[in-house]
């Protein structure tokens, strides 16, 4: 796995901390998933106080604060600075939403905010689209990680555009890439790892499942399977059949 700003992730799964039925289920799901990174919202921390923060710390995972809910560059930058003070980390998942219904990122504002935050000493994890040019601009702005969406946030649709995600992996072979948003099933997570992505970030698929803890276990196993499959160098798909049984020595009857 590629390093994220010099840090090796203990696990390719990044898991969000919102929407769980209870703090106890959140904790159980995290432990079942083996997730190495927890994404947290400054708004959640402000509302729940030290109890929530203490529980997350006790999980022993890396913390990735986010700027969820921000719609302007100024708002995102301000939220990032506040998060750094609260959580004590230069990591920031930069979310800058441009469309209310689809929650599609505002890529123009995203690039500007990424540049400002990088200059301010942040290590930026930008939630972006699968557009190659946007990816190039984000790297030029100082980002060392890209987080393209699989599908709109919370949609559970999986990987809407595998072609674009494969192209991004090929275009940025040395850059850590994370599929962020849209994962709904373990098979979606496995597929992202099969494509060579370094990690997946998900929240709703686990938190809103009928049994979040069981879904967390399923995600952990799927991610492991996808990672192993990618390492194994799988065969390429073909349009025509290819016999797996040799015909040498086969008897011919007249």
UniProtKB/Swiss-Prot annotation:
Enzyme Commission no: 2.8.1.10
SUPFAM superfamilies (alphabetical): ThiG-like
GO terms, molecular function: thiazole synthase activity
Keyword Cytoplasm: yes
Keywords: Cytoplasm, Schiff base, Thiamine biosynthesis, Transferase
Main location: cytoplasm
Catalytic reactions on record: [ThiS sulfur-carrier protein]-C-terminal-Gly-aminoethanethioate + 2-iminoacetate + 1-deoxy-D-xylulose 5-phosphate = [ThiS sulfur-carrier protein]-C-terminal Gly-Gly + 2-[(2R,5Z)-2-carboxy-4-methylthiazol-5(2H)-ylidene]ethyl phosphate + 2 H2O + H(+)
Positions bound to 1-deoxy-D-xylulose 5-phosphate: 154, 181-182, 203-204
TM region positions: none
Enzyme class at the top of the EC tree: transferase
Pfam families on file: ThiG
CC terms in the record's Gene Ontology section: cytoplasm
Biological process according to GO: thiamine diphosphate biosynthetic process
Locations listed in the record: Cytoplasm
PANTHER family to which the protein is assigned, alphabetical: THIAZOLE SYNTHASE (PTHR34266:SF2)
Function: Catalyzes the rearrangement of 1-deoxy-D-xylulose 5-phosphate (DXP) to produce the thiazole phosphate moiety of thiamine. Sulfur is provided by the thiocarboxylate moiety of the carrier protein ThiS. In vitro, sulfur can be provided by H(2)S.
Subunit structure: Homotetramer. Forms heterodimers with either ThiH or ThiS.
Family listed: Belongs to the ThiG family.
Name of the featured protein: Thiazole synthase
Source organism (scientific name): Ruegeria pomeroyi (strain ATCC 700808 / DSM 15171 / DSS-3)
Gene for this chain: thiG
